[in-house]
Amino acid sequence: MELDQIRKQINAVDDAMHRYFTDRLRCSEDVAEAKLQTQDSVYKPEREKQVYARFPGDADEEKLYRLYVRKVMQLSRYHQYGIFLGKGNVDTEFETQYRSVQAAINERDTTDASVKIELTPDPQAEQGMSIQDMLSVLGDFGTEVTVLQYEGSKVSVTVRVSGTDALESQRRLFYMLYKESVTYNMCVV
């Protein structure tokens, strides 16, 4: 088979995956609405373990598919956090920290600011994201990490933010990190 033909097949598979992903996001929206009604949390590690268990095996195909499913679930949670934020369902502690950072950026003469997030990831991913997941999600959304420090079990991540519009575009991501960390603090440095 010629490379062009193979690429056409790949494009067809990608198109089908896009349709399924869109369907998955719609389901995620329904899940978010149900969780809002029951005041449940977005991140449910036990549910994610159930999903992974559906795809056992050590063959390369199964391992790669579990990674794919893991990323899809991470993106679904990110989508759900956006729905929670859009409905005003935000933890007061996060909102206080976020508004403080927003005000500090507004007070500066420059639009370029560094935001430091100190957090404790969940090393066992029992109640939150691991450090690997956190770094992955920061990279996935184009967050410019300028400093990364470890101190015991805590991680300090400094990111560059170009004004309050850029900060607002990262709000959902920061909220996801807040909700899926053992501890969390955000400030301008």
Regions found by a protein language model. Give the residues of each.
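Domain-level signature for soluble enzymes in the chorismate/prephenate branch of the shikimate pathway
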Residues: 1-189
